[in-house]
């Protein structure tokens, strides 16, 4: 299949944005361990399960069927749908007032984020020659490190700023903890990336 000279690199930019958002969504919870434990009154073990099993186990298991789907159906729509789902689920974590609700949301994020790597690598292998492919893959893979670094650099001050603000009251939802507001801030921009990927 032939592509315009610009389109493959546009795809790499969008995929890299998606991978960056994915890394930020994964990392943000680790920056809010104290407030989440305090407000949900959960133990270290429960927090460890949120950070590990809730996301990693489902992410790993979902990678296999996601790869199968990427072979059979439109990779563009699989990626866009995955970004949309994990972004909404990250934002929906802002509504969690119970441990079980947050646990389920993180499970959903893990499953949704499993859609990106297999579809992205398959897409890039079609878009680029063997000579160009390593550069495209390298750019895409750098997103994880950039996302983690960005989350640490910006997320800490953001959460500290939110902690200093008066209680946030959202219509229908009610009072919102600062860490819940942080989930909204990092989750909603991903919806725009999903639109770019579609």
Predicted segments with their positions:
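Conserved MFS/SLC helix-loop-helix module at the cytosolic interface between two early adjacent transmembrane helices
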Residues: 61-100
């Amino acid at each position: 299949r032939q592509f315009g000279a610009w389109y493959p690199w546009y795809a790499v930019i969008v995929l890299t944005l998606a991978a960056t958002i994915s890394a930020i969504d994964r990392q943000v919870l680790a920056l809010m361990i104290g407030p989440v434990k305090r407000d949900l009154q959960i133990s270290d073990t429960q927090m460890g399960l949120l950070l590990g099993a809730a996301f990693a186990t489902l992410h790993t298991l979902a990678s296999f069927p996601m790869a199968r789907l990427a072979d059979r159906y439109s990779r563009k729509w699989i990626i866009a749908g995955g970004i949309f789902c994990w972004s909404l689920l990250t934002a929906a974590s802002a509504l969690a007032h119970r441990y079980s609700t947050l646990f389920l949301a993180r499970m959903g994020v893990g499953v949704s984020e499993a859609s990106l790597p297999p579809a992205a690598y398959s897409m890039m292998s079609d878009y680029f020659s063997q000579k160009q492919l390593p550069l495209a893959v390298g750019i895409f893979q750098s997103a994880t490190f950039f996302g983690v670094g960005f989350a640490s650099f910006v997320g800490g001050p953001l959460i500290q700023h939110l902690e200093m603000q008066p209680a946030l009251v959202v219509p229908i939802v009610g009072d919102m903890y600062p860490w819940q507001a942080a989930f909204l801030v990092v989750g909603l921009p991903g919806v725009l990336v999903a639109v770019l990927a579609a």
